[in-house]
Amino acid sequence: MERGGFHGYRKLSVNNTTPSPPGLAANFLMAEGSMRPPEFNQPNKTSNGGEEECTVREQDRFMPIANVIRIMRRILPAHAKISDDSKETIQECVSEYISFITGEANERCQREQRKTITAEDVLWAMSKLGFDDYIEPLTLYLHRYRELEGERGVSCSAGSVSMTNGLVVKRPNGTMTEYGAYGPVPGIHMAQYHYRHQNGFVFSGNEPNSKMSGSSSGASGARVEVFPTQQHKY
């Protein structure tokens, strides 16, 4: 399929009834080729470049597959194998989940006329979309992270959150809930075992209530145990 512009002009020149010397016609066509933009002279290269660009954009929609595989292998025994289709399925699920939560958090920011999505926006979006069971454990991790990063000055006398051997949360009714030591930073990992497994965490004792309301009905005395990266033994 021919492009417009100079191609149409060349047809009129070649089909002209007035004869022209062969040398003059050849020189004219060569000059015409030099006048065209480089992309017209190399259509195949342009087409391939466009396909590569589309491919890159498609890949940018997903979390890198190497990261997905690394996360999957943390929970699997050493001898386990992962098929390619399962890797791609998890990759698409994780990427879709990130987009789902981020989009909801972004809508909240737009309503409040803010440009920066905060961790609180993400937790709010997760709660609104029905992922309530993740809120309280992730909130604890967030407090731990911020304290160790020095972003918040937390003291025991202030009352809201304090750190001793673990993370202690004071609830509105005055009860205290202690969460076990989280290990060194930056190695804040999710639990790697399925012992009383709930949403990536391992609980001993009563499982904590994950609602954002702060109720202590199910959370009193619960401990979140975070293990280093280890392998299962079947």
From Swiss-Prot:
Organism: Arabidopsis thaliana (Mouse-ear cress)
Tissue localization of expression: Expressed in roots, flowers and developing siliques. Present in etiolated seedlings.
Localization per Swiss-Prot or TrEMBL: Nucleus
InterPro entries: CBFA_NFYB_domain, Histone-fold, Transc_fact_NFYB/HAP3, Transcrpt_fac_NFYB/HAP3_CS
Subunit comment: Heterotrimeric transcription factor composed of three components, NF-YA, NF-YB and NF-YC. NF-YB and NF-YC must interact and dimerize for NF-YA association and DNA binding. Interacts with PRN1. Binds directly with DPB3-1.
Gene3D superfamilies the UniProt entry points to: Histone, subunit A
Region (Subunit association domain (SAD)): 90-101
Molecular function GO terms recorded: DNA-binding transcription activator activity, RNA polymerase II-specific; DNA-binding transcription factor activity; protein heterodimerization activity; sequence-specific DNA binding
Keywords: Abscisic acid signaling pathway, Activator, DNA-binding, Nucleus, Transcription, Transcription regulation
Single GO biological process annotation from the record: abscisic acid-activated signaling pathway
The keyword Transcription regulation appears for this protein: yes
DNA-binding region positions on the chain: 63-69
Compositional bias of kind Low complexity: 213-222
Domain of life assignment: Eukaryota
Protein known as: Nuclear transcription factor Y subunit B-6
Stated family: Belongs to the NFYB/HAP3 subunit family.
GO cellular component: CCAAT-binding factor complex
Job of this protein: Component of the NF-Y/HAP transcription factor complex. The NF-Y complex stimulates the transcription of various genes by recognizing and binding to a CCAAT motif in promoters. Plays a role in the regulation of the embryogenesis. Involved in the abscisic acid (ABA) signaling pathway.
